[in-house]
Each structure stands twice: as structure tokens, then as C-alpha cells.
Amino acid sequence: MYNALYGPGNCVDMTKECYASGRNDVCSFADNFCANNVEEVLDIYALRDEYDIRELSPDPFPSTFYVDYLNSPTVQEAIGAYVNFSESNSAVSSAFGSTGDDDRESGTIEALKTLVSDDITVVLYAGDADYNCNWLGGEVVAGEVNAPGFSNAGYTNVTSSDNIVHAQVKQSGKFSFVRIFESGHEVPFYQPLMSLEMFDRAINGKDIATGRRTVKSGYKTTGSAKSTYREGNSTVQFEVVNATATYNTTSNEPDPISAKKSFKAANKRRLFKPAKRVVDLTS
């Protein structure tokens, strides 16, 4: 995997070529190569779910029962929805894939810098069991934004209403990066209380760490330069989780299977990117 990522002409070099050329075919080829040879490695060889490396594939979480809830007439009327909710759309995915969207930076960091300079609250966060959008990469992106004072801020524990530390945050002014503990890709599913309180604090202009301070210029968290917490393997699964299992957000792992449960969760499998193809990089 290291060679696939950093080897000559491989993922990193292809990504740089995508940035330099901006061509759809170059970026799509790079996107496909990186996905099939770096992103999917855990799925292929370790049989782990790249969206939650604690789980073996197929991983039944997050459960898909919420789709029926969101498509109920009562909910749609309450939120003013005019179309049905779909968890994913292959047509949209194909459209993004054809341009190599995943491999493009496309001014994302510059856009974040603009938000920061406009004094807009920005919270970047990631679940630390997510390999696909891993927190280490998120931390690097947060540093690239170069928000005033952020490089000198430190990580501190996030206090939530259940008095359990579910995360650590590094914040300077209205810009913050949050590492969510024991969480896969869809953080609100795995850590619902932490997600809700983080969101509530952000939109109300409060500090992410406690929710008690109104954030003003000069506010900065103090603590270690890196988030070094290690949670061990207590929630790692060594057998494929039953499709009928439910997830316990207190113990941060699947509940034991009850014989009374009869519902069946969908067996989800994220598809590979299209097969690699030869691209002329000289034209």
C-alpha cells in the first residue's frame, strides 16, 4: 500500500498531475487508481470496512431504517421536502467519478480560508475509526487552512452532558478540528450526543470543548500539540456482525443478538471504482 501511495508514478504523483492539468481523464484515472489500490486495501486484504475499521465486511452499520423514517409523509411535511430521500444515487456518483472529483482539491482549502477570514464558524471533524476520511488526514487539512493562532492551539477534551469524553478538539477563534473517539464515517450514528452538542455549540457561537464560553477573537484551546489518546481494541470486532444487530452508542459496539429480533438490515457494499485504464499524460 505504501508503494501504491508514494511509489513513482502512483497515487500521490497521479494526484499532483491531476492538480497540474485539471483534465477530467487524468483526474478520473488518478481517482480510480487511488481508490482501488489505497482506499480499498483494508476491504480487500483485511476484510475490514474502510468506513469503520473496527468492523469486518459486510458491516451492517449504520442501519438503513432511517430511510423509511425520512420518507414518511409526516416527516416530509414537517421538513418541507418535495422529493423522496435516497441514501445514495448511482447517477450522481458516476457524474462525480467521470471528472475524478475525489482526486481534486478544487479550491477547498482556499474556500475554508475565505470562511475563516469572513469570521464564519468552521468545524472540521472526523471519526477516528474511519479509514476512508481518516482523522489524521483531516488534521493535516485543518493545519493547511492556517487559521490565525491554530498552529499554537492545543488539543483538549470535549465535555459533554453525559460527563464522558467522546472527543478532543483543537480550536482557535471560530475555527476548530475535532477528533471523535470510537466513531466510524457517519459520526452522528456512532456518537449522536457528541454530534448534537458539537453542532449546537457551533451554531450558537460557543466553544466546542465545553459549550460554556462565547467564542471571541483570541480564544484558543490549550493542551498537547497532538491528540495522542489510544482506545485499544475493546470495540474491534473479529467476526462479521450479524445483519440484524443493533449498535450500542454507550458501549460503542454491537449489541448482543436477541432471538426475538426479526427485522433484517440491508447488506450494503460500496462498489469499487471503475477498472484502471491507460491515459495519455503527454497530450
Regions from the PLM with identified roles:
Residues 1-123, 128-136, 143-147, 176, ...:
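Accessory cap/linker subdomain of secreted extracellular hydrolases
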Residues 115-117, 168-172, 189:
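Extracellular/periplasmic catalytic domains that process cell-envelope and extracellular macromolecules
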Residues 120, 165-170, 182-183, 268-269:
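Generic hydrophobic/packing signal
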Residues 129, 160-164, 181-186:
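Histidine-bearing beta->alpha loop at or near hydrolase active sites
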Residues 137-140, 193:
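Short, glycine/charged-enriched secondary-structure capping and boundary segments
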Residues 146-173, 223-228, 232:
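Short mixed-charge
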Residues 189-200:
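Post-His helix in hydrolase/transferase enzymes
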